[in-house]
């Protein structure tokens, strides 16, 4: 097993360990020992096709078999410690046991980590692989390896594995989920590579609402148009689809709410509009949100929409926005015209972008020409970290060829 990787290629070795583990869990689910796991998945109404498509598996109650399997294949404890599959406190123990296993794959369909779910009420409900050189939670999304090929006009962000799987089974194969962590700028940049439009469908409880509110500015900063799907009265997409079906969920997608309007509507819950003081405070907070729009046209469009939907006097709101913007040095008022303009124009970023592109090009050249440099860099930088789509695609080929031990510059360029 190890000899198939080039000497010193730790990334290749870790990749093979994960592949062996995924195959082991997959077979356990379909064995007599995996009956409890398979019964659980069937109870969750997952079809055989869906279970197979996502490579779902099972970690049995008896531990030690996976460790023995890997040791028999020649992997030593030093590399197994870094795999995230075992704990070494008071002896060697498998991290996952008596759990349904969700293999986590990168965009190239390589297993980089695992998620495990208990079948009862034990805590923690979900257990994820620790971060390793292969597995960076902030730069990977569950289901993206399939969703990126969906050809849908958007991506749907969910909270958990089961939401993604349930949505894919119902035909919404553009669904993805962050990996036990809040949405990060890295996630947003990753989504931007494949779409300009994102729909948020987090749980409808208070925690889900807070998570959506945290995600919205991150997605906006990445240049993504964002809407929020209303799941009420159900908790999550899995529950909604089971109760109402795919057609009803599509209607919720079609009627998804603009993220800014969602923010304002959520904000309104903290105010009593029957009280003049509370109403004024609400309108001040709305004005403060509107001031954040840098472009006058966009700001004016949202101002009109907010005033129309929430029945706020437009003239009063326009004056408040102008005053707040002027105080913060964001907006200036043209004398007598009553119009708002940004005080500072954005400077073009062309020089900075050219510099980044040149740096990525140089890095790729070094990676292709020097194996030692690749081994050092590959532990920290992945193909999806390249900002330029062209270079990201080239990097994917480079990493793939180094993994197989057959580097061919001609094939990479082709």
Where are these regions (language model features)?
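Substrate-binding/catalytic subdomain of NAD(P)-dependent oxidoreductase enzymes
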Residues: 56, 68, 303-307
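Short, well-structured beta-strand/strand-turn elements
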Residues: 44-57, 171-181
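Phosphate-handling DNA/RNA-contact segment within nucleic-acid enzymes
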Residues: 10-20, 39, 62-194, 198, ...
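A charged alpha-helical hairpin associated with nucleic-acid processing machineries
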Residues: 106-108, 148-154, 182-198, 202-414
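Short alpha-helical scaffolding segments that buttress acidic/His motifs in well-ordered protein cores
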Residues: 21-25, 41, 55, 161, ...
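Single conserved hydrophobic/aromatic residue that forms the stacking wall/gate
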Residues: 1-8, 12
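Non-catalytic interaction/clamp surfaces of large macromolecular machines
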Residues: 10, 14-52
